[in-house]
Design a protein with these regions (language model features):
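Metal-ion/cofactor- or nucleotide/acyl-coenzyme-handling active-site neighborhoods
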Residues: 1-214
């Protein structure tokens, strides 16, 4: 079978050897969010502006990165566009400014911050991913979606604790950048939709075998 592993960041991920997955050339791996800190999956999926900023800021290029919000434009427009934000927002830049000939802009209203991210038009590992289900779906759902869109017919999900242990949203990276410290008390804002999205993704890709491993 054409097998893909979707690597989530729930605590149960510790039960699985990522190194074993990496050595199996018959498997394609799709990681979620900041998995890159630990393991270079074949593909890295992200849909949160702050996480995308972290990935690009660190000039991470070991995985093919799929961002649901990624619309780079030529730097010919950079000065006029960024200037329009400076009066009301703090502007923070990320990525390789010297090498990049394209840029993307992300606003983060809670802190009145605009992130300007630099990338290349040729040879970049970053690309836009358009989900089939919902823009509001979790990163894990987007990663499953991406694997299905690429034709994988057998999908195994690890570190998906909110599915295998309902109501458990603990995260391996809690307490680090972009992750809350009080993980045991945290419920994601869209958590009530996640179960629905998992059902929708299975229905949409009816011929794909999707399995969640504890």
């Amino acid at each position: 079978m054409n097998t893909a592993y979707i690597i989530g960041n729930g605590l149960s991920r510790k039960n699985h050897s990522l190194g074993t997955l990496a050595r199996d050339k018959a498997i394609t791996t799709f990681g979620c969010n900041v998995l890159y800190r630990t393991f270079p999956a074949d593909y890295l999926v992200a849909n949160d502006a702050l996480v995308i900023y972290e990935i690009v800021r660190n000039d991470y290029t070991e995985s093919k990165c799929l961002f649901t919000d990624w619309n780079p434009i030529s730097r010919d427009h950079e000065e006029s566009l960024v200037e329009s934000f400076k009066n009301q927002y703090t502007v923070i830049r990320g990525g390789n400014e010297n090498r990049g000939d394209m840029f993307s802009v992300y606003g983060w209203e809670p802190t009145n911050t605009v992130y300007v991210l630099y990338s290349q038009s040729v040879g970049t590992p970053y690309s836009k991913f358009t989900p089939v289900i919902s823009e509001e779906a979790s990163t894990g759902i987007h990663a499953i979606d991406a694997a299905c869109q690429q034709g994988h017919t057998e999908i195994k999900c690890i570190g998906f604790d909110s599915v295998t242990d309902k109501g458990n949203y603990r995260n391996i990276y809690e307490g680090t950048e972009n992750y809350r410290r009080d993980g045991e008390k945290y419920t994601p804002e869209k958590a009530d939709l996640w179960e629905k999205h998992h059902s929708l993704i299975k229905k949409h890709y009816g011929k794909v075998d999707i399995e969640y491993l504890s």
